C-alpha cells in the first residue's frame, strides 16, 4: 500500500482538502444529471453514490483523524448511509495508507530525540495496521516482542475544528436530523479526545492491570512508559 509523506495539520490545510473533495463531489453531481438523461434514476443514483463515496473517502484518508473517524463510525450504522458509502467508509477501520518510514522516524525524533532503531533492538518501519487516528508497528527489545502505536500528526489538535467542518456536510449529504446530529457528533468528539490521550491510556491500562492481577486467566498487555509518549504507545 502506498505510504503518506505528509498530513495536512493546520486548519487552513485541512479545510482546503475538504474544499478540494467538495469540488469533486460537485463534478459528480453534474455527471449524475447527465446520467439521468440516458439511464434510469436508480442507475444514475447508484453511480453518483459510488463516485461520491470514492472521492470523499480518498480525501478523508489523506486527512486522517476525526474527519476519517466520522466516516468510520457512520459506516457502522447501515441505516444511515447508502451501501456504496458503507463499503468505502468501512475501510477506515483497517485499510488506510500509513505514514512513510521518514515520517515515522520524525515522530520518534520529536518525542524521544532518537530514531526508533536507537530505542529498540529491531523496529519494522512498515506498519502492520493503519486506521483513522494511528498505526501500529512491530518492534523488539531485550527479547520481548512489542507493538508500537503511533498517532498521526495533528490529529488530537484538530478534533474540534475538523468536526465543525464535517458536521454540516454530513448532515446535508446523509440527512442526519436535528438534535440527533448534535448528540452524535458530541459522542464522536468525546470518543476521539479519549482515544488520542495516549498518556491517559497508558496510565489507566496499567492501573487496571494492577487492580486485576489476582484474577485467574485474565491477561493484560504490558505497557512501557519509558518507550511511550503523548503520541506513541509501546506494549507487548
Ranges and model annotations:
Residues 163, 167, 183-213, 219-236:
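Conserved structural core of kinase catalytic domains
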Residues 71, 136, 148, 201, ...:
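Residue-level signature of catalytic and energy-coupling elements of molecular machines
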Residues 156-158, 234:
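Switch/connector loops and helix/strand junctions flanking conserved nucleotide-binding motifs
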Residues 51, 55, 203, 218:
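Short, conserved clusters of charged catalytic residues that mark active-site
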Residues 1-135, 142, 146, 158-185:
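N-terminal accessory/targeting segments that precede structured cores
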Residues 93, 141, 150-152, 225, ...:
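Flexible glycine-/small-residue-rich
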Residues 93, 150-156, 188-194:
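Conserved protein-kinase N-lobe ATP-binding Lys motif
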Amino acid at each position: 500500500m502506498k505510504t503518506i509523506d505528509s498530513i495536512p495539520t493546520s486548519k487552513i490545510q485541512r479545510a482546503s482538502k475538504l474544499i478540494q473533495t467538495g469540488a469533486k463531489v460537485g463534478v459528480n453531481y453534474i455527471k449524475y444529471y447527465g446520467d439521468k438523461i440516458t439511464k434510469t434514476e436508480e442507475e444514475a443514483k447508484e453511480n453518483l453514490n459510488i463516485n461520491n463515496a470514492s472521492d470523499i473517502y480518498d480525501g478523508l484518508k489523506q486527512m486522517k483523524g476525526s474527519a476519517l473517524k466520522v466516516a468510520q463510525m457512520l459506516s457502522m450504522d447501515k441505516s444511515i448511509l447508502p451501501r456504496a458509502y458503507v463499503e468505502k467508509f468501512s475501510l477506515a477501520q483497517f485499510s488506510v495508507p500509513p505514514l512513510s518510514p521518514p515520517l515515522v522516524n520524525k515522530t520518534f525524533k520529536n518525542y524521544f530525540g532518537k530514531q526508533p532503531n536507537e530505542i529498540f533492538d529491531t523496529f519494522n518501519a512498515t506498519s502492520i495496521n493503519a486506521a483513522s487516528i494511528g498505526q501500529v508497528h512491530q518492534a523488539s527489545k531485550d527479547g520481548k516482542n512489542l507493538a508500537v502505536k503511533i498517532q498521526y500528526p495533528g490529529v488530537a489538535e484538530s478534533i474540534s475544528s475538523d468536526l465543525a467542518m464535517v458536521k454540516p456536510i454530513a448532515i446535508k449529504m446523509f440527512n442526519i436530523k436535528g438534535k440527533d446530529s448534535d448528540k452524535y457528533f458530541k459522542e464522536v468528539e468525546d470518543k476521539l479526545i479519549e482515544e488520542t490521550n495516549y498518556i491517559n491510556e497508558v496510565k489507566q491500562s496499567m492501573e487496571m492491570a494492577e487492580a486485576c492481577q489476582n484474577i485467574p486467566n485474565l491477561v493484560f498487555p504490558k505497557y512501557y512508559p519509558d518507550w511511550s509518549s503523548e503520541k506513541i504507545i509501546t506494549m507487548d
